[in-house]
Amino acid sequence: MKIVISKPDKNKLRQKRHRRIRGKLSGTADRPRLNIFRSNTGIYAQVIDDVAGVTLASASTLDKEVSKGTKTEQAIVVGKLVAERAVAKGISEVVFDRGGYLYHGRVKALADSARENGLKF
């Protein structure tokens, strides 16, 4: 008899965490949700009004302004860009949705950069 021990899939655990978090927070027109998605190569941020189901501002490593540097440096630039675009549309306060990721590394760098550039959360 062979016993197989399977390791849990990290992304499935993250998605489970994210669903649990999303049940507790929602973005409105007054205070939209700043959502983060992190892949192996890039990081994506969106400011979302969940009531209307509309993305109000977004930035990612696919943007032309973000091209060089380490992944953490790119996350800092993405945080700056999404904050500037949100402030330009009159958004100053957001609800931070870390997407089930730990508040560490690239996620923390993006959040700190967004705070420094005018978003409050």
Swiss-Prot record:
Under the heading InterPro entries, the entry gives: Ribosomal_uL18_bac-type, Ribosomal_uL18_bac/euk
Q: Name one GO cellular component term.
A: cytosolic large ribosomal subunit
Q: What is one Pfam family matched by this protein?
A: Ribosomal_L18p
Biological processes, Gene Ontology terms: translation
User: What Gene Ontology molecular function terms does this protein carry?
Assistant: 5S rRNA binding; structural constituent of ribosome
What are the entry keywords?
A: Ribonucleoprotein, Ribosomal protein, RNA-binding, rRNA-binding
| Summary of subunit composition and partner proteins | Part of the 50S ribosomal subunit; part of the 5S rRNA/L5/L18/L25 subcomplex. Contacts the 5S and 23S rRNAs.
- What PANTHER family does the record tag this protein with? 39S RIBOSOMAL PROTEIN L18, MITOCHONDRIAL, LARGE RIBOSOMAL SUBUNIT PROTEIN UL18M
Q: Which family does it belong to?
A: Belongs to the universal ribosomal protein uL18 family.
> What does the UniProt record say this protein does?
This is one of the proteins that bind and probably mediate the attachment of the 5S RNA into the large ribosomal subunit, where it forms part of the central protuberance.
This chain belongs to the protein called Large ribosomal subunit protein uL18
